[in-house]
Amino acid sequence: MSDWADWDHIVKIDPDKTLVDGETFEDVAATGTDAIEVGGTTGMTEEKMKRVVDACGKHDIPVYIEPSNPASVVHSDRHDGYLVPVVMNAGDVTWITGAHKEWIRIDDEIDWSRTFTEAYIVMNPEASVASYTQANCDLDADDVAAYAEAAEHLLGQEIVYVEYSGMLGDPDIVAAAADILDDATLFYGGGIHDYESARTMAQHADTIVVGDLVHDEGVDAVRETVKGAKDATATVR
């Protein structure tokens, strides 16, 4: 069974951003989240990534790097592995296979036993990740479901990630992706800011990802989203 099969909640930490004053990575690990993912779209460097991975890796919680480019890859025993984005609706093929090829070409230390992919479906045209990947975000529920099905059954993806990055998404679109998947785990990220938004999205997605909230509002707010996700999962099960 994959590490993420039982995750309800992930905190994503952007190494290019700071935590709320007075809070630590230990505080983040203690929110009740199931895992920490470390990554961001812009401003990523090996030095920034290493600082956050080393700090988070001291605590008893799974830590995964989500590399946005080869420069942000850190080889360390302080993390559990890599979750590498493959952007299904990217207009620039760099973010489907190009960056991945380049990483493999220049890095002879990749541990394939700890390296996995996430099939991203980017939905917010205003988000940095949409601009960065030239993603076509003009998608309806049928489009998203088709991308999700292609990811699982054509490309063998174990994780499908519906990403609204910075805005709360349409639950019906997330539900369409959830309904079409057989075994792949559905991640959802974007705009989760309180108990209710977490509970709503966790009723459809297997795992919700909370990012900006930890940097903007802090661990108390994150803790509420953990509760929302756990309550939704308990109801669904």
From Swiss-Prot:
Q: Which residues bind sn-glycerol 1-phosphate?
A: K12, Y161, V162, E163, Y164, S165, G166, G191, G211, D212
Reactions catalysed, as given in the entry: sn-glycerol 1-phosphate + (2E,6E,10E)-geranylgeranyl diphosphate = sn-3-O-(geranylgeranyl)glycerol 1-phosphate + diphosphate
Q: Which domain of life is it from?
A: Archaea
Q: Which residues form the signal peptide?
A: none
Matches recorded under Gene3D superfamilies: FMN-linked oxidoreductases (3.20.20.390)
GO BP terms: namely:
glycerophospholipid biosynthetic process
Which residues of the sequence carry a binding annotation for Mg(2+)? Answer: D14, T41
| Pathway participation | Membrane lipid metabolism; glycerophospholipid metabolism
Q: Which GO terms describe its cellular component?
A: cytoplasm
Q: Where does it reside?
A: Cytoplasm
- The EC number(s) this enzyme carries: 2.5.1.41
Q: What does this protein do?
A: Prenyltransferase that catalyzes the transfer of the geranylgeranyl moiety of geranylgeranyl diphosphate (GGPP) to the C3 hydroxyl of sn-glycerol-1-phosphate (G1P). This reaction is the first ether-bond-formation step in the biosynthesis of archaeal membrane lipids.
Homology family: Belongs to the GGGP/HepGP synthase family. Group I subfamily.
**Database matches in HAMAP family:** GGGP_HepGP_synthase (MF_00112)
This one is known as Geranylgeranylglyceryl phosphate synthase
| Source species of the chain | Haloarcula marismortui (strain ATCC 43049 / DSM 3752 / JCM 8966 / VKM B-1809) (Halobacterium marismortui)
